[in-house]
Amino acid sequence: MKVLYDHQTFTGSQYGGISRYFYELMNAFAGRQDIEFELSLKFSNSEYLRDVNYSHPVRYQHFANNLRANQLFSRINRLYSSTKLCLGNFDIFHPTYYHSYFLDKVGKKPMVLTFHDVVSEKSGSMFRVLGEGLSELKQQLL
């Protein structure tokens, strides 16, 4: 079985709970013979990926605080993930966050979607900027 993970949670941040979850999941899979996986990622500053042997993204820490650079690297990563989806060389797709860019690309392949928390739903008024539109995205993906 081959699992394809996308770029979303590893683009734009060095650390995070969701990226840590996927890092641990991929590390567990790395030691198994019956599971192959690929992380479709070209650019990342994630510290979790610094020393792993299954992903070697280009680091861009000198541009980490530059909004335009982050947008560019995010678009490149999304294009790369989209290309991998269209090629179809996987059995299961597991997106790492809630952006819906992949819905028209995954085809009939099975997909695993993990909802990590409901902070934005429960405390949306406190986190308007961070959670804006997140509930709607989650509903669209269901």
Would you name each region that the model predicts?
Residues 1-142:
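Carbohydrate transferase catalytic cores enriched for Leloir-type hexosyltransferases
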